[in-house]
């Protein structure tokens, strides 16, 4: 395992640094501000800001941002989720300092040049159209809208054409939103690579402390809480698609919940992306009804959900749903044997180890753990906890989460 170091700046910015021998350093800033922190009339703001921060800062034009990173052979990227916005780059470690300066300038000193941001509005509008043309992607948004109905979690990350045009009218809209949500105490600086902790802290103090326009103030955002409806339901949308797209799922546990890891293992057994998962073996291998099928468990800060997604010929949708429910019932009614559990654990251990070879994913996962847990355990520590899970605990969670009355179903037919 690599050494991991932690430090907090006086203004509240958390720093996590993982020292590796790689010549490549991943450096980024994750902010605990995403779609669920928006009001309905400003939906899409977090994602809009993510785009606009590439369009110019006090020290860099839009072209200079890209040229600076690509000129040293690096890569820069960003993404928005329901709860976070992240900006990060990968460069050779000797360019760490200038890369952090660029990222900090983007996050702390954007200019929102109207000419540049208007171009980005067109780009995002096209992104919305593209998303609407992809049922395999759109169904995830519609499912979240369904399962989190009445909550800000139901809103799409991209926003709508109407809200995007509204929030892009004046630079003051995004600047005001950033002043409220891009707080230092909601930021994580993450660094992974062959640079010293002293270098990281010294650079962070210069870029994120002394130069930060966001000072700690008496600001207490309202706590975000979501209570799901006790009654699940089904919904069907008419879409002009060759296949029927199906998604079903229910609410699960939030980040840090004692049963979160049990749900993680249970989902891996059910349909977690391998060809030996129960759903894949049944619907693909045994019956040949789908090309692909998988499930995922998504923990959030105060809630969570899991879902199964598949696409099939319209005449097979009922059989596919029946087979999905059959596998869920099997997990509710029948405990795993010791042999089955050990096989599931061996499989998960290998998956975690292989996944850990992806340094980019490691760095991003480390940042998210730091944001919510204030520490970043490595995969070996996580797996050590998973190994303690019993068949009884798996069955208990299956009965809580997979209960028929709790399962929402969405179809594009």
Where are the model-predicted features located?
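Charge-rich, well-structured scaffold segments of protease-associated domains
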Residues: 8, 65-227, 253-254, 271, ...
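Short amphipathic
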Residues: 6-8, 233-239, 410-411
């Amino acid at each position: 395992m690599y050494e991991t170091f932690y430090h907090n700046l006086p203004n509240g910015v958390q720093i996590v640094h993982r020292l590796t021998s790689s010549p490549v350093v991943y450096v980024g800033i994750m902010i605990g501000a995403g779609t669920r922190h928006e009001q309905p009339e400003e939906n899409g703001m977090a994602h809009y800001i993510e785009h606009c921060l590439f369009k110019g800062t006090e020290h860099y034009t839009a072209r200079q941002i890209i040229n600076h990173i690509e000129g040293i052979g690096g890569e820069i990227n960003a993404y928005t989720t329901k709860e976070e916005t992240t900006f990060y780059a990968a460069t050779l470690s000797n360019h760490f300092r200038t890369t952090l300066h660029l990222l900090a300038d983007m996050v702390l000193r954007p200019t929102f040049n109207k000419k540049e941001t208007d171009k980005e509005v067109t780009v995002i509008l096209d992104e919305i159209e593209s998303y609407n043309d992809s049922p395999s992607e759109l169904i995830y948004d519609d499912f979240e809208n369904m399962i989190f109905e009445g909550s800000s979690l139901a809103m799409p990350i991209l926003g709508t054409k109407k809200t995007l045009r509204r929030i892009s009218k004046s630079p003051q809209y995004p600047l005001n939103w950033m002043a409220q949500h891009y707080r230092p105490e909601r930021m994580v600086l993450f660094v992974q690579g062959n640079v010293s902790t002293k270098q990281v802290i010294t650079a962070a103090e210069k870029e994120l402390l002394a130069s930060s326009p966001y000072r700690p103030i008496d600001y207490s955002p309202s706590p975000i809480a979501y209570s799901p409806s006790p009654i699940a339901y089904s919904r069907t949308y008419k879409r002009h698609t060759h296949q029927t797209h199906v998604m079903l799922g229910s609410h699960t546990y939030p980040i840090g919940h004692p049963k979160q890891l049990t749900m993680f293992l249970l989902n891996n057994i059910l349909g977690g992306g391998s060809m030996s998962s129960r759903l894949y073996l049944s619907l693909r291998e045994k019956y040949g009804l789908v090309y692909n099928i998988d499930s995922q468990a998504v923990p959030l800060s105060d809630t969570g959900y899991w879902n199964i997604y598949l696409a099939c010929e319209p005449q097979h949708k009922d059989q596919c749903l029946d087979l999905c429910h059959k596998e869920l019932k099997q997990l509710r009614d029948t405990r795993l044997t010791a042999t089955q559990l050990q096989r599931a654990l061996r499989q998960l251990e290998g998956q975690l180890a292989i996944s850990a070879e992806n340094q980019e994913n490691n760095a991003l996962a480390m940042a998210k753990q730091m944001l919510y847990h204030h520490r970043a355990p490595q995969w070996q520590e996580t797996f050590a906890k998973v190994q303690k899970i019993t068949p009884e605990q798996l069955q208990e969670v299956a009965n809580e989460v997979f209960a028929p009355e709790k399962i929402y179903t969405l179809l594009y037919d």
